[in-house]
């Protein structure tokens, strides 16, 4: 989802003095992550994106669907394979991220019998950017601040019950007819009950090229993060996307991705959209 959301946000940086848009997306991801069996998750996000001069801000709240409470989404946009959070069950002792689960080497066996709703509202996430360089002829560099508020019930499996806050840099530039976007944010992640999650650096780099005399743009991306738990490899994935810009200023982006490490989704696909609401 981060690919779709990020590229649509970048596309919203127009010459308009002020704009407001509805942004949303849907993503399906599947993989075994650090578990001994495969699982999946679907993520639906709805939010608003606002820009005025050098400032851009966005906020959204997700609806999450998954068959068991094995995965949780951090504010960094990364999947945290907790093994299921109950808010009262202690960890296994062998893996600090395996709350209430058994471990086999570096893999966790998901626990049985944890109360869990298949559909739930996740924690809302907000982001704000301040552009340092205003000259479009040169690379655009922005300071980024972000936060995830712990509003979802941790016992439902859809929230960590802790604040996540992040700060970093993002950039954009044109090279040989292509647009290059880069983003790196350090996240201080709150530990869910019974788990130990490391703070993380989350990064992404995307390259997009518009097809000649066409509203279509092809995009490639690589994204990842530092390790979230001791003994667990860092997630890394690659993806491709195709975006379509409508005359009304609306845009759509379809993506597919593949995990390059076990802790990333083995396969993911998503759809993102942006609909302008007001422009001055």
Question: What does each model-identified segment do?
Answer:
Residues 16-176, 180-191, 198-239, 248-255, ...:
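Transmembrane beta-barrel domains of Gram-negative outer membranes and organellar outer membranes
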């Amino acid at each position: 989802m981060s690919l779709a959301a990020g590229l649509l946000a970048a596309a919203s940086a127009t010459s308009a003095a002020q704009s407001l848009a509805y942004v949303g997306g849907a993503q399906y991801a599947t993989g075994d992550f650090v578990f001994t069996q495969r699982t999946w998750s679907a993520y639906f996000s709805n939010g608003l994106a606002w820009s005025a001069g050098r400032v851009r801000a966005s906020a959204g709240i997700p609806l999450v669907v998954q068959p068991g409470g094995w995965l949780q989404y951090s504010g960094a946009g990364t999947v945290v394979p907790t093994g299921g959070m109950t808010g009262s069950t202690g960890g296994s002792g062998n893996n600090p991220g395996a709350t209430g689960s058994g471990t086999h080497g570096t893999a966790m066996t998901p626990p049985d019998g944890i109360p869990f709703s298949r559909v739930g509202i996740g924690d809302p996430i907000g982001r704000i950017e301040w552009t340092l360089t205003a000259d479009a002829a040169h690379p655009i560099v922005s300071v980024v601040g972000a936060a995830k508020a712990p509003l979802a019930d941790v016992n439902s499996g859809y929230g960590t019950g802790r604040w996540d806050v992040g700060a970093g840099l993002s950039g954009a530039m044109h090279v040989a007819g292509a647009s290059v976007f880069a983003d790196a944010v350090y996240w201080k992640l709150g530990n869910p009950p019974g788990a130990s999650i490391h703070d993380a650096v989350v990064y992404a780099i995307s390259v997009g090229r518009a097809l000649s005399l066409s509203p279509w743009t092809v995009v490639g991306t690589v994204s990842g993060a530092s390790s979230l738990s001791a003994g667990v490899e860092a997630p890394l994935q690659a993806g491709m996307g195709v975006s379509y810009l409508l005359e009304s200023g609306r845009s759509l982006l379809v993506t597919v991705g593949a995990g390059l490490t076990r802790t990333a989704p083995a396969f993911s696909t998503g759809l993102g959209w942006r609909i302008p609401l007001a422009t001055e």
